[in-house]
A protein has these predicted regions:
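Short, solvent-exposed loop/turn elements at domain surfaces
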Residues: 70-77, 122, 371-372, 404, ...
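Short amphipathic alpha-helix adjacent to the substrate-entry channel of hydrolases
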Residues: 375-391
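C-terminal subdomain of alpha/beta-hydrolase-fold enzymes, centered on the catalytic histidine
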Residues: 516-671
């Protein structure tokens, strides 16, 4: 790519220069469009639900459902092999009679499997019969797993097979129930099977979600994850579900933190009030059960019959289900091309309810992007129990068409307002230990939280003191909030990834020209700038920061704010970590763009005065998704946690940072304003 200087003074032949011009514009399109273009789908509906018993029980065999070989062996021992050719109910009842005389693990397992097969056959016609048989499967699987009088081998594949039978029988029963009833915590159900009556109370066992948060439920097994590399599941008992959040009282100001149709993981477990004793079938009549809803992000195991048992969980599919919405894919383009239309959309977002005691990690996206760009890292980070037990992840959405210092000012205000809403009494210490993670331009937005402006930032706007600038109240307030600020005392650590600390050569004459054609500058910015120039002739020169109206302009190497940010000393309580992408030497982009990630040169992304710096072999669009970058962020979060936990035990240490936080997002002491004409 030609540099700005070369483009201005080149004496190359016209055809060569035209080719370079075309290449520059093409690079603009590829560079800017790619981050906003995620995968077509994040989750797709399967033709049939995923079922771990499919191969074992020959779901797709020409001869139909068949018991496993070990169950066939049990049937042969009791002379029941010839009873397979029927609906399965008679076979189950005959096997159950043998089992009552000899209640051993093998017959428990065989009864569970035969009952499950019979239930699947009955489900297409007689759903009450199917529910009855699924209930029998649940009881036998439960007894196989937990009856204290049985001797079982946990290394035997049948042990895991019994878990699968329990889970699949419960899921299949829930599918039947969901066709007729809404499963919501706090509700009660009356279920009639062929021979029994069940009183089912649905209870919510999470401290995060409330009964009214549940709008609808989907089965995680119905969906295949497409847009996320790794899928995180936990193996145990229960049915993983996707819960779609109900939009609650919009008058609650905290409601703005949650995106519409947010989905979250749930694991459902059925607990019988009374389980038949060993060797006994479940009697007819009425039975009471609890259908328990657990949050697998906070509850990994539960007590069953005096034993701690892990929950079956799926953390990734609910995330992919939420991301699979066309409206989310439109956000990057809207935020870049027309920042004005972002009004009401920008701000801080959560994918879980606020959790007191957990440290917020705020992830800030880059140019022509949105929080979706963080989902790969987020999915990987929260798979670690230590991370999800101590951290909560927040995301910042902002219009990327405007200069990054304007976005930084808005984020400063939004963080302050969030503190007021979430912790009005200021008693929550975790909110004084925020970690900011910024990719690309988001790193610059984050870095502007780490130091106090003094007059240095204003001097990139004008050499005339601000108290002499004439402007009305709103325009003056905006100037002061954007160009005068203090280091954010709630932020303790920042991580910048693929950040153009010295600008990017891709922000050259051609890309900046194209950006001005693409981006609609916010009307408030235009009116404010026009008023300032009209009221203050001669106070602002051509190099003033006020003349920079788009994000592409703000990322140019000659942007006057970048040297100020490099020279500014960060607050004494602040830690800074840096991650740099470098493409392999043989890559075509490396040969064209030089050493770096293809968009940001190494010399621009590299920093000397940081706590740590990691070089990752990745291009600009993938550096924050690269496994080594994710591992580095996880390492930093563990270090952050260790330092916080160790601090009270160090009597010689001072406070980690000032405890005073300006909740109103005030700037440094305001100078006296000049009168407006």
């Amino acid at each position: 790519m030609p540099t700005e200087r070369a483009l201005r003074g080149s004496t190359l032949p016209v055809r060569c220069r035209a080719a370079r011009t075309g290449a520059a514009i093409l690079c603009l399109i590829l560079t800017l469009a790619a981050p906003g273009c995620g995968p077509e789908r994040y989750a797709t509906l399967r033709k049939t639900p995923q079922n771990p018993l499919e191969n074992q029980l020959q779901f797709t065999a020409i001869k139909g459902l068949q018991p496993s070989e070990r169950t066939m062996q049990v049937l042969r021992r009791f002379g029941l092999e010839q009873q397979l050719h029927g609906d399965g109910r008679d076979l189950y009842e005959q096997l159950e009679a043998f089992h009552e005389r000899e209640p051993i693990p093998e017959t428990h397992y065989a009864c569970a499997e035969v009952a499950y097969l019979a239930a699947r056959r009955a489900a297409t016609g007689d759903q009450k019969q199917a529910l009855d048989l699924y209930g029998a499967t649940l009881v036998h699987a439960h007894q196989f797993l937990f009856d204290p009088g049985l001797s079982r081998n946990v290394y035997d594949p049948e042990f895991r097979g019994a878990c699968n039978l329990y889970n699949q029988a419960l899921e299949s029963a829930l599918r039947i129930v969901l066709k007729q009833n809404a499963l919501r915590p706090g509700a009660s159900l009356q279920l009639e099977t062929a021979t029994r009556h069940f009183d089912v109370e649905i209870v919510e066992r999470s401290n995060a979600w409330k009964n009214e948060d549940f709008a609808r439920l989907e089965f995680a097994s119905d969906y295949e994850v497409k847009g996320l590399t790794n899928q995180y599941r936990g193996y145990g008992l229960g049915v993983p579900l996707i819960a779609v959040r109900n939009c609650r009282d919009e008058s609650d100001p905290r409601e703005k933190f949650y995106p519409p149709d947010l989905s979250f993981p749930v694991t459902v477990f059925l607990r019988f009030e009374v389980v038949p004793a060993r060797g006994e079938a479940m009697p007819g009549g009425s039975h009471r059960c609890l259908l328990e809803f657990y949050d697998p992000l906070s509850t990994a195991d539960i007590d069953i019959a005096g034993t701690r048992v892990p929950l079956e969980s799926d953390l990734t599919t609910p995330l992919a289900y939420f991301l699979d919405k066309p409206s989310l894919a439109e956000l990057p383009t809207l935020g870049f091309v027309n920042p004005d239309k972002y009004q009401g959309l920008e701000g801080l977002y959560m994918v879980q309810p606020y959790q007191p005691g957990k440290i917020p990690v705020l992830m800030v996206h880059g140019l022509w992007s949105s929080p979706i760009t963080w989902m790969e890292m987020f999915n990987d980070l929260r798979s670690a129990k230590e991370i999800r037990d101590h951290y909560q992840f927040w995301f910042y959405l902002y219009p990327t068409g405007q200069p990054f210092w304007v976005s930084a000012s808005q984020m400063r205000r939004d963080l302050a307002q969030a503190r007021v809403l979430l912790d009005p009494s200021r008693h929550e210490p975790a909110l004084d230990h925020l970690v900011l993670v910024g990719h690309s331009m988001g790193g610059l937005v984050s870095k502007l939280q780490s130091f106090s402006s003094g007059d240095a930032v204003w001097h990139t706007v004008s050499k005339q003191p601000i108290q002499l600038v004439k402007a009305d109240g709103d325009v003056r307030d905006n100037l002061e909030h954007v160009y005068f600020f203090q280091a954010n005392p709630a932020v303790r650590r920042i991580i910048t990834i693929g950040t153009p600390h010295r600008g990017s050569k891709f922000a050259n004459d051609f890309t900046r020209f194209a950006a001005h054609k693409l981006v609609t500058v916010p009307q408030a910015m235009i009116r404010g700038t026009q008023e300032i120039y009209r009221e203050n002739p001669g106070a602002f020169d051509a190099g003033s920061l006020l003349n920079i109206t788009t994000s592409i302009d703000s990322l140019a190497p000659n942007c006057p704010l970048l040297p100020v940010m490099l020279a500014a000393p960060r607050a004494p309580w602040m830690h800074h970590h840096n991650i740099v992408g470098v493409i392999e030497d043989k890559a075509l982009v490396r040969r064209v763009a030089g050493r770096g990630d293809g968009i940001v040169e190494y010399d621009s992304a590299h920093l000397d005065n940081v706590d740590s710096e990691k070089v990752v072999p990745a291009d600009h669009l993938h550096v924050h998704r690269h496994p080594l970058a994710v591992l580095e962020v996880r390492r930093i979060l563990r270090q952050h946690l260790a330092e916080i936990q160790a601090w009270p035990r160090r009597p010689d240490a001072g406070p980690p940072h000032p405890r005073v936080y300006q909740a109103s997002a005030e700037i440094a002491p305001r100078p006296a304003a000049a009168e407006t004409r």
